[in-house]
Structures are given as C-alpha cells and as structure tokens.
UniProtKB/Swiss-Prot annotation:
It comes from the Eukaryota. Keywords: Cell projection, Cilium, Cytoplasm, Cytoskeleton, Flagellum. GO terms for biological process: flagellated sperm motility. Microtubule inner protein component of sperm flagellar doublet microtubules. Expressed in testis, prostate and placenta. Microtubule inner protein (MIP) part of the dynein-decorated doublet microtubules (DMTs) in flagellum axoneme. May serve to reinforce and thus stabilize the microtubule structure in the sperm flagella. InterPro entries: SPMIP8. It is found in: Cytoplasm, Cytoskeleton, Flagellum axoneme. The lineage of its organism: Eukaryota, Metazoa, Chordata, Craniata, Vertebrata. The gene is SPMIP8. It comes from Homo sapiens (Human). One of its GO terms (cellular component) is axonemal A tubule inner sheath. This is Sperm microtubule inner protein 8.
Length: 216
C-alpha cells in the first residue's frame, strides 16, 4: 500500500510537504524467484494444478509462472513451522528411554521396586498353555437354540440372528441367516446360480467353503 504525497506551495514561495490522509492505493505484489527465497521443502503457498494449468494456457513467462515464482518472502520460508530437512533440536522421547523409564530401570537394578500387590496370586493369572482347554470348555458350555418347526408351509429363515460367542461376551448379534429367494419392495430377488447346489457340491480342495465351516 502507498500513500499519496502532495507538494503544497506557500505564500512565501517555499514548498512544504503535505500528506493527504486516508488515501491509499494498492501496490502490485512483488514476485520472487522460488530458488532465491526457498531453501526448505515446506511451501507456504504451494501452487495448485489449476494455477499451473492456467499459467501454462496464458503462456506466462518464467518470472510470472507460479511454478517458478512466489509471492512469499524469504523470512516466511525461514520461519516455516514444518520441514523435512535437518535434525530436530529436541528428539521425541519415544525414540529413547524416557526419564521415568530410566528411574524405573535404576530402581529395578537396585531392587527397590515394590512387590506384587497383595491379594494377587501368580497362579491365578491366565496361563497361555491352558488356553486350548479353557476355550474348549467355553465352547461346550455355550448355549444353543432350535429353529422353529418346519411343518408350516410359509416358513422363512430371514432375520434369525446367530452368533459365534455367548451373549455375555459379544452382547450383539453379528450374523443373520438370509433366505433365497428373498423379497424386496419390488418383488422377488433374482435367484443366485449356486443356491440349488449349495448342499450338493463340496467345493474345491484348494479353498474352504463358508458353509462347510461350523458356526457354533
């Protein structure tokens, strides 16, 4: 921005400088060569593809093209808050042992760490070697449900909820049985090509089929 300055003549023939107030004219922004002001990877005003395409269509000269010039100054690049060059002054604590970790390590070597809280027995802790037995007992004790009687003519299976785990564990229904053919608001949906052969073919020896895997 610039201010208009007028030279006002006086009666004695001298000339005094008079600045007219509140009259500002916009000045054209100065373009700087990108290589002269930028020494980092960070670009405060990164040119977009649209700007570069526009300058290419306008056949702008190199000193006018946004790919080689910028309105940013050198101090704006120097004071950038992000850069991928150089080593940070203060490295992250996660890259090395923290101060708390060093204290605990020293106390551990000195034998000053507190023992296990009273009431907790190591025998009661979960043992990974008994995981298979625990899982087998858990699955065998899981509840089962029966499907309704199939003697009725209009019997559908859509919407019946099934689960892998007991309700005490999952608290939600994860899977639902779907019926083929099924209906939507437009009518009957197309029948899949493998619906009638679901229980006739046993799949390939190189892949496991979902219906051969028990869900209970």
């Amino acid at each position: 921005m610039a201010r208009i300055i007028d030279l006002v003549p006086w009666d004695d023939g001298s000339t005094h400088v008079y600045a007219s107030p509140a009259i500002l004219l916009p000045m054209e922004r100065q373009r700087n060569q990108l290589a002269g002001v930028k020494q980092q990877l960070y670009h405060p005003a990164l040119p977009t593809l649209r700007h570069m395409d526009r300058d290419t269509v306008k056949a702008c000269l190199p000193d006018e093209h946004c790919q080689s010039t910028t309105y940013c100054r050198k101090d704006e690049f120097d004071n950038a808050h992000f850069t991928l060059l150089g080593v940070p002054n203060k490295p992250l604590q996660c890259l090395d042992i923290t101060a708390t970790g060093q204290k605990l390590r020293n106390r551990y070597h000195e034998g000053k760490l507190a023992p296990i809280a009273p009431g907790i027995n190591r025998v009661d802790w979960p043992c990974f070697t008994r995981a298979i037995e625990d899982w087998s007992h858990f699955v065998s004790s899981a509840g089962e449900f029966k499907l309704p009687c199939l003697r009725k003519r209009a019997e559908g299976l859509s919407g019946y909820a099934v689960r892998y785990l007991k309700p005490d564990v999952t608290q939600t229904w994860r899977y639902c049985l779907s019926q083929n053919p099924s209906l939507d608001r437009y009518g009957q949906k197309p029948l899949p090509f493998d619906s009638l052969n679901t229980f006739r073919s046993f799949g390939s020896s190189y892949s496991r089929v979902n219906y051969l895997t028990p869900w209970h």
